[in-house]
Amino acid sequence: MSGVLILSARVGAGHIRAAQAIQKAFAESGATESVQCVDALDYANPLFRRLYTKAYIDMVNTMPALYGFYYDEREKRAKHELLRPAFSRLNTRPLIKLLEEHQPDITVCTHFMPAEIISWLVREKKLATRQAIVVTDFDIHVQWLCPSPAHYFVAIDEARAHLESLGVPPTAITVSGIPIDPVFSQPKESGAMRDKHGLRRDAIVILISAGGFGIGQVDEVLASLLQLRHPAEIVAVCGQNEELKARVDRLAGDVPAASRVTLKAVGYTTAMDEYMAASDFAVGKPGGLTMSEALAYGKVFVVVNPIPGQEERNSDHLLEEGAAIRCNNLPILAYKIDRLLNDLQRLISMRENARRLARPNAAHDVVAKLQLLEAVPG
């Protein structure tokens, strides 16, 4: 390959993280081709960019039921939509110009918006590229489907079957798993990771991606977990949200010194793999990337209040496979975890299920398949 362009969109962190994971896997593979990673929204007009991100966040946070309805309705209509893709093209002319000038040999999309623009350019014979589409959820929504030929990378066999039912040839589908940072494929000993990050060895460790919750919901989640009957350390990762970290730090300071449950706030970190390896459970919103990272180290995922749509469908898959539990009522979150801890055989089985489902090498598998596809004339 001589030129690869990876395109994503910052609508939720998962799409960007998947793109970065693939770019990193290309670098680790020793590939000599040019590999660039761009956020498609950087090549959109400012108003469209703001509307595209803000509308999603606002609807998810304030009207989740409406978002779920919209998500399901789009599934019924997506194959026949004309106005929305045309509106996207109208507002992403700099992206279209980039693609026409760059003419990458392969385009890899981890979000459907740039994928549909590339598909249109290919149909209009303005772009000659091999298109790859990497779905970042366990489920496949029809909005990912493109009219022009493309190779699809999906998380599970069920997604493959869904695509085949929609007319995609089996040879155009690879069940790769969801690409996560290749660092999650490296074995790590839990005790060593606890020592490295100053975590307790005498307690279960619960990892929370606190940034995925609203401020008020974080308070409820932590208040419930502090009622655990088992000795536990709660590690709340707050990312770059300094206000959230300060709030969790204050809550941690209010925990009595003799409490069996302790709380630790972590700001922005590049060691999520190490914190995940150190943990017993991952608690959070069921994004495809976050759940895949938990599976990589065989951790049971505790799903909290999934929004209707992709989060609910993601959680359904792990619940069906016995690798997750779900809590819809935050006051009983501690009860549900305590109940699982009291059933050792069930806990062991769920951890085994998580390891069975894990695809920690997904990013490298995507890259290897892309290199094979490029070697085939066409």
What is the predicted function of each stretch?
Residues 21-102:
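Conserved N-terminal ligand/cofactor-binding loop architecture of enzyme catalytic domains
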Residues 191-192, 199-278, 312:
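Donor-nucleotide binding loops and adjacent catalytic segments primarily
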Residues 275-313:
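A donor-sugar binding/catalytic signature common to diverse glycosyltransferases
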Residues 346-360:
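A short, well-ordered alpha-helix in the C-terminal region of glycosyltransferases
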Residues 359-378:
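C-terminal alpha-helical cap of glycosyltransferases
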